[in-house]
């Protein structure tokens, strides 16, 4: 059964706040009783909710987990919000003999409790007192609407009670049904509170919207006006969001938008990017689960572009190496169309590389090039062991280390030419012939 209720809310002004409380005419509520919601009630969660009821503190599911449940998806991570302060939560958990972990979140109002081998992250309701585009000074509150106001998008501003009651202050449920991504209140204001919200908008657009192209003009204008604010955001935070954009839906549309709105230079992307190459590669990799750097490499013309990206975003070493590899080899290491075995150049590269991630890199390159048949073959291919060692060569009477090294290299080339078929005896007999 679905029940909807509406409640009148009056706008509130507090001079200490950095912004005006957003006026919201109605609070929309409904009952959710889906299998995904019911599956959340583990022994740990039951114990947690019982404790909060006993201590007269409100506790609700918050943010992304609510969005997922409304979409019929069981959330992987659940954030909880409460009217209890961190001090009250600590006293409550200590009295109940419940262990608390990860105390680093306490200064932000988050306490992590461990019940029945599960961790529960619970954050006190907050209002932003001041913001600087990166961080916020917060004050605790017991007002659920005020906490909802400080969140980025309407679809992330909802709460869910444990009786299944949805609390929606800013039409998040309606936006979710209509596949609409909107900021809570004014886009410009939300963005200026934390400029990373520009990338979060793009990320959730790729996640929520069915067909690309429908954006509020006010939102795009606010992004373009405030894109330079991303220059002050740490590279690590930007990379987390950008990676999710690259592996999400509508990536072609979103990357073009990032360039059209002049966001690119502030997040480490090259000004002279090859968007035509990006368009081609985005089609090549569609449906083949590329790594984020694989698609991103199509924007880079030279390896130095990868190095500059790393300086800005502090990407992982293996990600940087993959980007350098693709930019270097996307044209040089290509299938030999006149060869009876077009996979051979790629296999030879892996054999010569002797690096543990060489096969992964080559598979990503094949995705980039759109060589889907070769990719399937490569994924089924196992690297054959080279059958000759330095010890084998010593047995035939050669003791010089330098000579042994040179012979091993010659034998490896012969073995490669044979399609990795020559066996030890054949290779050792080759030494005697030479």
From Swiss-Prot:
Pfam family, one: PolyA_pol
Effect in UniProt of substituting residue 121 to D: In SIFD; uncertain significance
Entry keywords, A to Z: Acetylation, ATP-binding, Cytoplasm, Disease variant, Disulfide bond, Magnesium, Metal-binding, Mitochondrion, Nucleotide-binding, Nucleotidyltransferase, Nucleus, Phosphoprotein, Retinitis pigmentosa, RNA-binding, Transferase, Transit peptide, tRNA processing
UniProt KW Acetylation keyword: yes
Broad class of enzyme this protein falls into: transferase
Modification type Phosphoserine: residues: 400
Required cofactor names: Mg(2+)
E.C. no: 2.7.7.72
Binding-site residues, ATP: 64, 67, 151, 194, 197, 200, 203
Entry keyword annotation includes Nucleotidyltransferase: yes
Result of changing residue 190 to I: In SIFD; loss of CCA tRNA nucleotidyltransferase activity
Gene3D superfamilies registered for this protein in UniProt: Beta Polymerase, domain 2, cca-adding enzyme, domain 2
One GO CC annotation: cytosol
UniProt binding sites for Mg(2+): 77, 79
Binding residues for CTP: 64, 67, 151, 194, 197, 200, 203
Annotated positions for site May assist in discriminating ATP from CTP: 152
CDD domains, A to Z: NT_ClassII-CCAase
UniProt disease annotation: Sideroblastic anemia with B-cell immunodeficiency, periodic fevers, and developmental delay: An autosomal recessive disease characterized by severe sideroblastic anemia with onset in the neonatal period or infancy, recurrent periodic fevers without an infectious etiology, B-cell lymphopenia and hypogammaglobulinemia. Affected individuals show delayed psychomotor development with variable neurodegeneration. Additional variable features include sensorineural hearing loss, retinitis pigmentosa, nephrocalcinosis, and cardiomyopathy. Retinitis pigmentosa and erythrocytic microcytosis: An autosomal recessive disease characterized by retinitis pigmentosa, red blood cell microcytosis and anisocytosis with mild anemia.
Family the entry assigns: Belongs to the tRNA nucleotidyltransferase/poly(A) polymerase family.
Subunit structure and binding partners: Monomer, and homodimer; disulfide-linked.
Protein name, as recorded: CCA tRNA nucleotidyltransferase 1, mitochondrial
Taxonomy of the source species: Eukaryota, Metazoa, Chordata, Craniata, Vertebrata
Gene of this entry: TRNT1
